[in-house]
């Protein structure tokens, strides 16, 4: 994956900020620090190949340490909203958002309480599909969901299909053999 040097520099600043804050608010597992670029940065950046237009509004739910939302903003997505219920993490996200040249809004609320619209909704290490869909019922996603998922993705799809109608594509993660990117659109509740 080719990344411009200016973006790499900003991502390095972001990495250093995470390392500094991680000591006090546990943003990422200490076990992932040695493999930070592959585990967190590239894992987030790989979503860019499924974002055809960077001039959109992207919402990242359960943003935590800013993956993938902050990374996608640094990579060029023009408007990103980060939804995070933990105030301490929101304070970190506000600091981290200054690294990007693009618009980042931090929303310190529970996801299910928010009514907003966007082109794309992302999340990483958040929850299963049913929970994601339930929590985001008040969010109007015009284009698609881009969800970074682990090895239980097929079970999640089968379970979600019992309550929801949706189209999906499964993409292989470039950072993890068992990881997948679920590209979901046309979501409607059936029960």
From Swiss-Prot:
- The entry's S-adenosyl-L-methionine-binding residues are 62, 67, 111-112, 124
Its name, as the record gives it, is: Ribosomal RNA small subunit methyltransferase G
The record's GO CC annotations read: cytosol
Q: Which domain of life is it from?
A: Bacteria
Q: List where in the cell it is found.
A: Cytoplasm
Bilayer-crossing residues are none
EC top class named in words: transferase
The alphabetical list of record keywords is:
Cytoplasm, Methyltransferase, rRNA processing, S-adenosyl-L-methionine, Transferase
State the EC number(s).
Answer: 2.1.1.170
Similarity remark:
Belongs to the methyltransferase superfamily. RNA methyltransferase RsmG family.
User: Which GO molecular function entries does the Swiss-Prot or TrEMBL record give?
Assistant: rRNA (guanine-N7-)-methyltransferase activity
């Amino acid at each position: 994956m080719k990344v411009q040097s200016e973006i790499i520099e900003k991502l390095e600043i972001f990495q250093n900020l995470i390392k500094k804050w991680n000591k006090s608010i546990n943003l990422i597992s200490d076990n992932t620090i040695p493999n930070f670029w592959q585990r967190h940065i590239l894992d987030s950046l790989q979503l860019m190949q499924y974002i055809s237009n960077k001039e959109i509004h992207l919402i990242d739910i359960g943003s935590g340490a800013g993956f993938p939302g902050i990374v996608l903003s640094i990579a060029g997505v023009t408007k990103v909203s980060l939804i995070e219920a933990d105030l301490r993490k929101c304070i970190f996200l506000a600091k981290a958002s200054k690294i990007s040249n693009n618009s980042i809004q931090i929303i310190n609320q529970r996801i299910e309480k928010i009514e907003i619209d966007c082109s794309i909704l992302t999340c990483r290490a958040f929850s299963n599909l049913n929970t994601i869909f339930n929590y985001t019922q008040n969010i109007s996603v015009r284009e698609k969901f881009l969800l970074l998922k682990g090895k239980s993705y097929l079970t999640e799809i089968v379970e979600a299909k019992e309550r929801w109608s949706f189209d999906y594509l499964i993409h292989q993660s470039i950072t993890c053999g068992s990881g997948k990117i679920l590209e979901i659109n046309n979501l409607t509740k059936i029960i």
